[in-house]
Amino acid sequence: MKKIFFIHFHEAELKEKIQPLKQAGYKVEHHFSVESVADLQQDLPDILVICLDRLPSHGRRYAEWLWEAKKRQPILIVFCGGTPEKVLITKEKLPKAIYCSNEKLLATLEKLKQ
C-alpha cells in the first residue's frame, strides 16, 4: 500500500480528512503546524497530499521543496481542495502535480495505486 504524507494547516480538519484514507488501508503520516516544519528528509512518502483549503502558499512551498532535488521528483504530489483562484495559482507553479477536490481525493489516490 502506498505511503502518504498529508499536509493541511488545521489539525481538526486534517484528522477528518485522513480518516477515509486510513480506512482504505493507506499508511498516512501528517503535518498541520505552521510553527514547525514537517520532516520529509528521512522517510520519503510515495505520495505527498497537500490540502489547499488553508494557507495554500505554505503547501505550495512544501511541494516546491520536494521537487527541487532530482531524487525526490518521482514522488507524486496531489493537491486537493482550495478555491479556484488558489488552485489556478498552484497549477501555474506546479503543472505536473495532480489536482482534485476534497471529495474525490480517495478516488484519485485509488487510481494512482494501479
Residue ranges of predicted features:
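The C-terminal output helix
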Residues: 111-114
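Two-component/phosphorelay signaling modules centered on CheY-like receiver
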Residues: 11-31
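Conserved acidic carboxylate
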Residues: 7-8
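Alpha4 helix (beta4-alpha4-beta5 surface) of REC/receiver domains from two-component response regulators
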Residues: 58-61, 81-100, 106-107
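Conserved phosphotransfer microenvironments
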Residues: 48-70
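His-Asp phosphorelay/catalytic-motif detector in bacterial-type signaling
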Residues: 70-77
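Acidic, metal-coordinating helix/loop segments flanking the phosphotransfer/catalytic sites
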Residues: 32-47, 57
